[in-house]
C-alpha cells in the first residue's frame, strides 16, 4: 500500500492524456447511444405487456421471464457476433451485445406502468380516439419518467463500465473505451511490477504500488458518474420504490 500521499499514479495516466480523452469520447458516444436505444426498446416491450387486454399476455410475460433463466453461452455468442454481424474492432462491439434487452428491466418498467398509470387514463384516451402509440407517447412516457430515468441509469452504468466486450471483440487501441484502456494500463503496470528488469518503464513506476495505480484508475473511470448521479438520485430512488411494488 502507499506509504505517503503522491500523484505519481495520476502522472502516469496523464502521460497518456490523448489516448485517455479519445477513450472518454468513445465511451460517452457508446453510453449515450446505447442508453437511448435501450430505453426505447425496453419501454416499447414493457408497454404492451402492461396492458390487461393484450391477447396472450401471460405467455408473453412468461417468455420474457424465461430469458432470465438461461444464456446462449459465450462461445456461440462470440461466433455469432464476429462471423454473422462482423462487429470485431467496431463501435458495434460495445453496442449490439449490450442491446440484448434485460428481462429484469422490462419487468421493472412493466410493473411501474401497471401500478402507477390508472386504467381510466387509457380508457379516456381510447374514447377520444387516441391510438396505442399515441397513448404510449403522450401518457405512458411522461408519467413513466421516474422508472425511465432509473432504467436509463442502469443501462448507462452498464455501457460505461463494460470492458468484457472490449476484451472479446476489440484489439485495436484506437477503439478502446475508457474501461478497456484502463484495464490494459493495470495489466501493463502489473506486468512491470512482476518483471521490473524486463521493461523500459521508469524506476518510479516500478516501485509504485499497484494499489495506487488501481485506485487512481478507478477514480478516473468513475469521475463522470460521480458528477451525473446527484442530479438523477431522486428519480432513481422513486423509480425503484414504485417499480418494485409487485411483479
Locate predicted features.
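A hydrophobic, multi-pass inner-membrane permease signature
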Residues: 1-247
Amino acid at each position: 500500500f502507499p506509504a505517503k500521499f503522491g500523484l505519481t499514479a495520476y502522472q502516469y495516466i496523464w502521460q497518456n492524456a490523448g489516448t485517455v480523452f479519445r477513450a472518454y469520447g468513445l465511451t460517452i458516444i457508446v453510453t449515450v447511444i446505447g442508453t437511448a436505444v435501450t430505453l426505447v426498446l425496453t419501454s416499447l416491450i414493457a408497454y404492451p405487456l402492461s396492458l390487461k387486454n393484450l391477447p396472450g399476455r401471460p405467455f408473453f410475460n412468461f417468455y420474457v421471464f424465461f430469458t432470465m433463466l438461461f444464456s446462449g453461452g459465450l462461445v456461440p455468442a462470440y461466433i455469432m457476433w464476429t462471423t454473422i454481424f462482423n462487429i470485431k474492432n467496431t463501435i458495434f462491439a460495445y453496442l449490439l451485445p449490450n442491446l440484448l434487452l434485460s428481462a429484469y428491466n422490462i419487468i421493472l418498467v412493466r410493473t411501474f406502468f401497471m401500478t402507477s398509470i390508472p386504467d381510466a387514463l387509457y380508457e379516456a384516451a381510447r374514447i377520444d380516439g387516441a391510438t396505442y402509440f399515441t397513448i404510449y407517447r403522450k401518457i405512458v412516457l411522461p408519467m413513466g419518467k421516474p422508472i425511465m430515468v432509473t432504467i436509463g441509469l442502469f443501462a448507462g452504468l452498464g455501457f460505461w463500465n463494460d470492458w468484457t466486450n472490449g476484451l472479446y471483440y476489440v484489439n485495436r487501441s484506437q477503439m478502446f473505451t475508457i474501461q478497456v484502456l484502463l484495464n490494459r494500463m493495470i495489466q501493463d503496470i502489473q506486468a512491470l511490477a512482476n518483471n521490473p528488469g524486463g521493461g523500459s518503464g521508469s524506476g518510479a513506476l516500478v516501485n509504485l504500488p499497484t494499489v495506487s495505480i488501481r485506485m487512481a484508475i478507478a477514480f478516473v473511470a468513475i469521475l463522470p458518474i460521480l458528477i451525473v448521479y446527484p442530479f438523477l438520485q431522486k428519480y432513481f430512488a422513486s423509480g425503484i420504490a414504485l417499480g418494485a411494488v409487485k411483479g
